[in-house]
Amino acid sequence: MFTEEMVHTALQTWCDNVVKVGKVHAEGGDAKAFSLQVLSESYDYDNGHVLFKPTLTFGQQTFRPTKEGALSYFVGGNSDYPDDNGFKLKPWVKVWYSKEDFILHGDLAIVQCNVHFIGEDDSHIFVNKSFVFKLCDDGKVKIILHQSSLPYQP
């Protein structure tokens, strides 16, 4: 059964991993390998189906139903996804969530929130997120839906 504490842990882990990927990259580490590890630990690509709509995608590559597509969005460098620049490589030095709301439904948590990103250059953006987290049979929490968009600007 999913709990409120598990929602906050899952969201904080997601935010922390964004910072960690950028740090690995900035320190000359293998950001691609680290991102693959994060994808395996945090998303259900290896065992199931994931619905992922990154913030800055469009056209034929708007949705990323494969681990390869998600990895490309996070770290770039894949010629099959020429518009991906590696969103997580900026690096982001601080990432946090706010204004979360959620529905707990058995082994699922359906979550909406804002996520704020502070760049090394002190830039600040925030995006609207929707996640569905699943409590898997092995006790691990995995993302099965991740939707991200920029706030509407009239």
List PLM regions with ranges.
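Basic/polar N-terminal segments that are highly enriched at the extreme N-terminus
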Residues: 1-16, 151-154
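N-terminal membrane-sensor/transducer module of prokaryotic signaling receptors
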Residues: 10, 16-36, 147
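A solvent-exposed, acidic/Ser-Thr-rich amphipathic alpha-helical stretch
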Residues: 25-99
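Mature soluble binding/inhibitory domains
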Residues: 4, 8, 21-25, 49, ...
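Short beta-strand edge/turn micro-motifs at domain boundaries
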Residues: 104-112, 116, 120-154
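Conserved aromatic-histidine-acidic binding/catalytic patches
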Residues: 2-6, 103, 121
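N-terminal, helix-rich and Lys/Arg-enriched segments in bacterial and organellar proteins
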Residues: 18, 22, 37-43, 111-115, ...
